[in-house]
Amino acid sequence: RSESSKHHIMQKLAKKEFNTKSKKGYRGQTIIFTNSRRKTHKIANFLQNKKVNAAAYHAGLSYYKKEKIEKDFDRGKISVVVTTAALAAGVDFPASQVIFDSLVMGNKWISPNEFSQMLGRAGRPSYHDRGIVYLLPEVGHDFDGESEEAKALDLLESDSEDVFIEYDEESSYEQILADISSRSIKTTDEL
């Protein structure tokens, strides 16, 4: 698949999804994951030129720009957010569809846990009845000695990796003090 044909596929999938509505009343919206800030803008601009309301979203944007995109997407004013791993975790967007433009983020393959977090952005139960995930690997594209289509199969067949959490007493105290000073914790029971 050439980059141009991938962009056309993304456009068709995003338009089709935006024309669907969940039983909970939300229109279908799409998150596209790609591997660089530059590509977020390139894909978003392509989609905008094809009459798809898309926005690039990455860590290099100002806080206010990111917040505006988040609010506009949440309100259904934007049908597509094209992002790096910046939206992989912790954001509860009303997306019904996730498209992987690339399985490389930055300069490494995404891990099974990252993949799980990213595909988990599609079909949030409070918004949609189902989630759809598309992988658009480039056949013949190798990275770090492995083809993208082989990596796609590995990720689809993988289980999440174990997570090991190490607690540092000093860091725990710092976090507790930060939570208290920001008033996110109001009672000792919440500690």
Where are these regions (language model features)?
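C-terminal accessory/connector segments of nucleic-acid motor ATPases
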Residues: 73, 161-191
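Conserved interdomain linker/interface between the two RecA-like ATPase lobes of SF2 helicase motors
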Residues: 1-36, 138-140
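Beta-edge loop/turn motif
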Residues: 74-95, 99-102, 120
